[in-house]
């Protein structure tokens, strides 16, 4: 997804009169998931040709002329079911592989979207399910823990059916119960936050498309959109202040007008998405991994075995990687 950190260069290989240009793409990837069997990839590239402006995302296919090297497998300790590699590409591709298309002005190819614009749009959505992944692991933990705790002392000569030691096992200990509740609550809270974010983006998708349509009709692009939103921000703040007032004090007509204003609703929903997406990703994966360690500890020695009930040890290790999915925590 980077253009400068890992090499990603795009130049024109040929451009005949009346024909679309053919590009020469050079790209090396790092820690690319599913690369072992992917027959196409999307790559971020920077212009290495004065006839191409800025950066863009392009589609590279296995059958394109040139080098499509999947690279060596990454020696991961976790998430073993996904193939991760460091690929290398040196390919010729048609110009229509630019994601989002392009225009030509004064002999210069201008991509409609930079690589950063596309990546931002993708990541702010894909970070949501990453957070839910960790929360799902937490929600799967209480059942095997309860089963282990209640069966812990069964089979012993001093433990007979019907006694608290037989029926409850380790759950006679208050500490075990409190820790278990913490694990369950963290899973429920993380899931609630994750699904709230998912529903928010469902609503945002509709508003975002309408927002893009309005700007396209008016021919407003780039920084000109920022100028428009500076004015819209005043209306958005007015809407938020009005929503906090008692119904009797609200101007119903004005409130309805602002609720029907696509740009106002876009600005508000976009602001919410900018908070809930990173918050869910950071808290669900970071705090989730910490709480999963608690789950492992409640399994005793079983917690670090390959056949641990619920595979909690493996899930805890997997959670360490999820904290870096779609950008590390520092990002």
PLM feature spans:
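A glycine-rich, basic-preceded beta-loop-alpha segment at the flavin cofactor/substrate interface
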Residues: 87-126, 146-171
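Terminal amphipathic helices with adjacent charged low-complexity linkers/tails
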Residues: 154-178, 185, 206-222
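Flexible, small-/acidic-enriched active-site or ligand-binding loops
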Residues: 66-98
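C-terminal helix-coil-helix/basic helical segment that borders enzyme active sites and/or dimer interfaces
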Residues: 188-281
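A short core secondary-structure module
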Residues: 18-70
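Glycine-rich phosphate/cofactor-binding loops in nucleotide/flavin-utilizing enzymes
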Residues: 262-266, 304-331
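Charged, glycine-rich active-site and insertion segments that engage polyanionic ligands
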Residues: 273-302
């Amino acid at each position: 997804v980077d253009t400068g950190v890992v090499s990603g260069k795009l130049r024109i290989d040929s451009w005949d009169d009346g024909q679309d240009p053919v590009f020469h793409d050079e790209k090396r990837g790092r820690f690319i998931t599913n690369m072992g069997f992917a027959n196409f990839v999307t790559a971020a590239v920077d212009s290495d040709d004065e006839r191409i402006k800025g950066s863009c995302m392009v589609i590279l296919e296995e059958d394109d002329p040139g080098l499509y090297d999947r690279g060596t497998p990454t020696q991961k300790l976790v998430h073993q079911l996904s193939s991760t590699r460091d690929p290398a590409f040196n390919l010729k591709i048609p110009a229509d592989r630019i994601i989002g298309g392009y225009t030509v002005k004064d002999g210069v190819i201008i991509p409609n979207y930079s690589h950063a614009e596309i990546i931002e749009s993708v990541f702010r959505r894909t970070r949501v399910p990453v957070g839910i992944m960790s929360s799902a692991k937490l929600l799967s933990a209480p059942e095997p823990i309860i089963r282990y705790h209640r069966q812990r002392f069964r089979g012993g000569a001093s433990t007979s059916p019907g006694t608290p030691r037989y029926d409850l096992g380790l759950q006679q200990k208050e500490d075990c119960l409190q820790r278990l509740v913490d694990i369950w609550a963290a899973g429920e809270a993380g899931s609630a936050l994750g699904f709230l974010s998912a529903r928010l983006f469902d609503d945002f998708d509709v508003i975002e498309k309408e927002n893009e349509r309005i700007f396209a009709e008016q021919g407003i692009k780039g920084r000109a959109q920022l100028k428009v939103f500076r004015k819209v921000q005043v209306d958005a703040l007015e809407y938020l202040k009005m929503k906090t007032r008692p119904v009797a004090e609200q101007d119903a007509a004005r409130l309805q007008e602002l609720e029907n204003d696509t740009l106002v609703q876009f600005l508000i929903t976009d602001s919410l998405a900018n908070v809930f997406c990173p918050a869910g990703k950071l808290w669900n994966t970071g705090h989730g991994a910490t709480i999963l360690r608690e789950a492992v500890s409640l399994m005793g020695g079983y917690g670090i075995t390959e056949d641990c009930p619920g595979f909690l040890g493996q899930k805890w290790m997997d959670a360490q990687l999820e904290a870096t999915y779609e950008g590390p925590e520092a990002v």
